[in-house]
Amino acid sequence: LKPNSDYFIINYKNITENINNHYFPEYYLSKELGIDIYIIDSESTINQIKNAYQHIVKYKNVYKIHLIDGGCDSLLSGKESHLATPTEDMIHMRAVMDIDVSQKIISCVGMTCDCNQLPKNELIYRLNEINDILIDTHIWNKNDKYVKKYYDIFYKCQPRRSIVNSLI
């Protein structure tokens, strides 16, 4: 299903081919959560990404956008070296800035996975410097039911093919 040329919708029920030997985490995520997964092409321009978000917000009556960064590139200042995928993260953050929703959140999962040369405390300090931006810091506990669910789902999404998920 592709209701707009700027994004795709993945619903595991619509995929009939055997995908066992293919890296397709969106399929597994859709299957495990029982929901549609929206994919915006990583080769898209900022305007195409913004159009995709605007269309999804309107089409699904979205009131909150929650971006999730695997790692912490979205928290960096640009002065760091050996970055992972900061361009992709920054493009999505910029595109979402202009979207009219009541709440916008970004979460960094696996904060020290790709930014290990910069201490986590330094990143948190930077966020505290900017008023009203840091909502919460949370260290995951494997006994927490939601953390267990995360591990369960992402293990099925073939985390060995994702640097961040394999390190979390």
Question: Can you say where each PLM-predicted feature lies in the sequence?
Answer:
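Structural signal for hydrophobic packing residues in well-ordered secondary-structure cores
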Residues: 33, 37, 57-60, 96-100, ...
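Generic structural signal for well-ordered, non-membrane alpha-helical segments
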Residues: 18, 22, 26, 46-49, ...
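Glycine-rich nucleotide/cofactor/substrate-binding loop typically near the N-terminus or early
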Residues: 1-37
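Short, solvent-exposed amphipathic alpha-helical segments in soluble enzyme
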Residues: 82-83, 121-125
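Glycine-rich, charge-decorated loop segments at or immediately adjacent to ligand/cofactor-binding or catalytic sites
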Residues: 106-108, 112-123
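A conserved mid-domain beta-alpha-beta active-site/ligand-binding segment of alpha/beta enzyme cores
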Residues: 123-168
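Internal, conserved structured core segments that host functional sites
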Residues: 33-96
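Short, flexible loop segments at boundaries between secondary-structure elements
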Residues: 94-111
